[in-house]
Amino acid sequence: MGSLSRFVGRRARRTLLLALLTTRMIPVVSILIPIYLGLQRLQLLNTRTGLILTYGGLLLPFVIWILEGFYRGFPAELEEAAAIDGCSRLRTFTRIVLPLSTNSLFAAGAFAFIASWSDFIVGLVLTTSEAAWPISVVLAQSLNPISEPSWGLLNSAGLIAALVPAVMAFVLRRTVMRGMLSGALKG
């Protein structure tokens, strides 16, 4: 990510970011069949690993877009000072860039988690066993059309499902705001 912001020319960087954002405009429903067939071929259908890989692939352009703003505004002087002190690129990244980018990483991770937590269609299509169902599919499957659902249990489960991202957002609110704003200002 840092290499995209630092070493790629402005025109190429804009083209790459536009291509990433364009992939986010493709409806997920239109690519579910190829994802399904790919996971079936890899024998990852109906597994949590398959869901994690799918959500990771679907949310990666969004996360890259969020982090690019931070890395674009990252001061090159810090990297140059580390190079003068004898740090390799890897050590510069692990000792300087990564610790300073934790807020942005938390912000991107929080957005990705909430997007995958609240998604329904991917979990419904790619899983059939109850063990691999995400919470949104569990709640939907509990609405049995044959018998009267237990509304108290369903409401309690819905509240718990809504509390997880709410508590996470509350706990990480300052970190997420710092991460969102860290790449927002120029200069």
Regions from the language model: what does each represent?
Residues 1-187:
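A structural signal for multi-pass alpha-helical bundles of membrane permease subunits
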